[in-house]
From Swiss-Prot:
Protein name per the record: Galectin-related protein
Residues with PTM Phosphoserine: 22, 25
Encoding gene (name): Lgalsl
Self-association and partners: Monomer.
Keyword vocabulary terms for this entry: Acetylation, Lectin, Phosphoprotein
Length: 172
């Protein structure tokens, strides 16, 4: 992992057009970030809605085991926030697992993908597009899978969490 930081320092406000870096300084969404700190937790202003997209660009670590990108309903630890979608890249099995966790209960895990898109020590671009019935997930511009909503109040999905063996270079 690239490092860690206290929870209060790691919160970054995601806006439709503006971001704050991990030091709280405002920057434009199209500005290249010099490696944001992992684990990362950021607020998605206004939550998700059909047509809204979350972009994560980064570089996989040289010897990765796994990394995860989650969209959650807040950042509470106790009780844990509901997880609308968790994408977990597992390098030993070359799997991209998807699941949710609502009121402490994990849903049915999904794993079918046409190919494993992540390569150690290489950059990647993940786009999570919110549509009315589902999240549509693209990696490096290719649609990889759909994940149907298990949380129906999309605006409650207002937090992104990223952890594991990667470096974040840009969020939007």
């Amino acid at each position: 992992m690239a490092g860690s930081v206290a929870d209060s320092d790691a919160v970054v406000k995601l806006d439709d057009g503006h971001l704050n870096n991990s030091l709280g300084s405002p920057v434009q969404a199209d500005v290249y970030f010099p490696r944001l700190i992992v684990p990362f937790c950021g607020h998605i202003k206004g939550g998700m809605r059909p047509g809204k997209k979350v972009l994560v660009m980064g570089i996989v670590d040289l010897n990765p085991e796994s990394f995860a990108i989650s969209l959650t309903c807040g950042d509470s630890e106790d009780p844990p926030a509901d997880v609308a979608i968790e994408l977990k890249a597992v390098f030993t099995d070359r799997q991209l697992l998807r699941n949710s966790c609502i009121s402490g209960e994990r849903g049915e895990e999904q794993s079918a993908i046409p190919y494993f898109p992540f390569i150690p020590d290489q950059p990647f671009r993940v786009e999570i597009l919110c549509e009315h019935p589902r999240f549509r997930v693209f990696v490096d511009g290719h649609q990889l899978f759909d994940f149907y909503h298990r949380i129906q109040t999309l605006s409650a999905i207002d937090t992104i969490k990223i952890n594991g063996d990667l470096q974040i270079t840009k969020l939007g």
